[in-house]
């Protein structure tokens, strides 16, 4: 985030959101819904990214290539380090069959589709999910998918429907809520 645009109250929200996630993963029974903190992080990230893009669009300075480069520099080094380190360690700790499955996980991580991989193969709340070292990358995949597609959507709306941008954003919010409800009805994990 740019220093001049720093919003300390958002850091406060981040701190509040991370606590239930930590307590949930630490196994505290009272925080079984701690994963809601991840949703809060998604909302904060969406808000910040939308603001950054819209400010640059208004000034006619937005370059999608620069946006992607900034995101890649921020996320890819740590992601590749964790994925590669995990693959190397897996050679010493896993059976050949487990390594094959784990390699598929690693590929899904670097392609930013691990959320779909885990959804289709293990499920986040499955007891065996605790044995998946890269399970936590599902949320990063969701975030990266947002970073890849949402700017393109915003540019399209800005270019062709600038006066109706707020209506489109409200439509996205409503569509998102409908998808959440449908996901709950289908017991997606």
Region locations from a protein language model:
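Membrane-interface helix/loop caps of multi-pass membrane proteins
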Residues: 1-189
């Amino acid at each position: 985030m740019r220093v001049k645009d720093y919003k300390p109250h958002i850091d406060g929200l981040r701190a509040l959101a991370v606590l239930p996630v930590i307590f949930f993963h630490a196994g505290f029974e009272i925080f079984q819904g701690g994963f809601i903190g991840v949703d809060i992080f998604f909302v904060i990230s969406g808000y910040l990214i939308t603001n950054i893009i819209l400010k640059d669009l208004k000034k006619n300075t937005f370059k999608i290539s620069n946006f992607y480069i900034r995101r890649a520099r921020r996320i890819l080094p740590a992601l590749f380090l964790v994925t590669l380190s995990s693959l190397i360690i897996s050679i010493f700790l896993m059976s050949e069959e487990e390594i094959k499955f784990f390699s598929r996980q690693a590929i899904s991580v670097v392609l930013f589709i691990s959320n779909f991989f885990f959804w289709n193969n293990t499920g986040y709340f499955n007891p065996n999910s605790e044995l998946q070292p890269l399970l936590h990358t599902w949320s990063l995949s969701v975030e990266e998918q947002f970073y890849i597609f949402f700017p393109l959507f915003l540019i399209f709306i800005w270019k062709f429907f600038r006066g109706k941008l707020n209506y489109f954003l409200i439509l996205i919010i409503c569509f998102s809520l409908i998808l959440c409800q449908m996901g709950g009805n289908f017991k997606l994990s």
